[in-house]
């Protein structure tokens, strides 16, 4: 029951994840492992240091993990940020000006996921 509450709290897609991971025990296991993932920290520190390649990697990884675990709002926010940070051939982010606008949504969604996992 706490899994349903956690996914409802974060606006996640539990039914799709159940099809992918098959058991609630596996979903709980991987959700808790997510708390050890360093993609958000990588993203934040890379943005602070101006390392856009590493920032893109952090956002892209966060996007993939959140998609796989059905953390829908985080996936959507990380997807938009990842697209903005995608580097062109010259190594310039696609839409660097959008990053300050997009980052708060990623932070908020990430915090919500972390808080929701605590319910499990």
Residue positions per predicted region:
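Alpha-helical linker/edge segments of TPR/alpha-solenoid repeat scaffolds
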Residues: 89-91
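Short, well-ordered alpha-helical segments
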Residues: 51-56, 66-87
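Long, amphipathic alpha-helical coiled-coil segments characteristic
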Residues: 12-61, 93-120
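Intrinsically disordered or compositionally simple regulatory linkers and C-terminal tails
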Residues: 1-5
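N-terminal helix initiation/capping motif
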Residues: 6-11
């Amino acid at each position: 029951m706490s899994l349903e509450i956690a996914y409802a709290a974060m606006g996640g897609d539990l039914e799709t994840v159940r099809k992918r991971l098959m058991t609630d025990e596996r979903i709980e296991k991987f959700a808790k492992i997510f708390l050890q993932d360093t993609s958000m920290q990588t993203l934040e520190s890379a943005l602070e240091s101006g390392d856009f390649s590493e920032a893109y990697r952090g956002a892209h990884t966060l996007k993939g993990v959140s998609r796989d675990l059905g953390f829908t709002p985080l996936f959507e926010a990380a997807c938009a940020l990842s697209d903005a940070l995608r580097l062109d051939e010259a190594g310039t982010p696609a839409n660097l000006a959008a990053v300050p606008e997009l980052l708060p949504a990623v932070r908020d969604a990430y915090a919500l996921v972390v808080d929701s996992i605590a319910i499990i």
